[in-house]
């Protein structure tokens, strides 16, 4: 109700005032009627979705599509976008061409870069080969601030698992592009 909304806004404002603006709130928009997309997003990041390989509801292109579609309306840099442990629960995706295991770990991370990447997993369960992602993360950190300072817009086709898609970050005279070549006949 409106009173709850007003109380929550007062709480956010008071915390920001007393900390000199040194707090970022993490708003959870995963269920029910919650703030995040169109209200309270000035207070911090938006935790967008709960995906789990346990439930076979994590597909990299679904996550990419959600970010791509929302970035038309909500600042992409405010959205926490998860990538999961692609080595878990592979048997649940047997024969599925869009199974997480069919993508590189670097690709899974890259699908989150226009937003706020979130490693949604128990890192202790990762195999040694997962550590190779460190070089990509370091390179991303070099441009992350500038990339997120621009207006981030979706480009290409809507992610479907078989499209060419991506994001453009525009900031005055400069910008960045991220392209994804999903599984399609023209991928050679």
Predicted segments with their positions:
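Carbohydrate-binding surface patches
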Residues: 158-188
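Glycan-recognition surfaces
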Residues: 3-125
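Short amphipathic alpha-helical surface micro-motifs
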Residues: 7-8, 21, 101-102, 147, ...
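Aromatic- and carboxylate-lined catalytic core of secreted/periplasmic carbohydrate-active enzymes
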Residues: 112-156
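Glycine-centered structural positions embedded in regular secondary structure
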Residues: 44, 150, 164-166
